Amino acid sequence: MRWIVDGMNVVGSRPDGWWRNRRLAMSTLIEKLEHWASSQSEDVTVVFEHPLSPPLESSVITIAHAPKAAANSADDQIVAMVRTAENPQDIRVATSDRMLSERVGALGATVYPAQRLRDLIDPR
């Protein structure tokens, strides 16, 4: 199973003060995804609106960004990734964004709620 994670949607699924330090929240999500992906042998791509400077990197998961930061740009990037996938039915998109869920679902991907993924990779 391939996972595509709507990064900021998953970060925002838990009101833990992430908005005070966006970079730390993104970095923490990446660390949690890395640990989970390596322990479960999952193929994970996390998508953000734009890269940070300096960029966040990982040797375990793929970190992707929209080509240009704009409203819904990460969503559009996720849809493009599902659309161009050889087997979209083998993709699980982690998001709670209703419009994004509808778009990727129409392409054959499965949607996994953001809060459920957050609880899976970072139990309270």
Q: Model regions: which residues?
A:
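Nuclease catalytic cores that cleave nucleic-acid phosphodiester bonds
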Residues: R2-V5, N9-R124
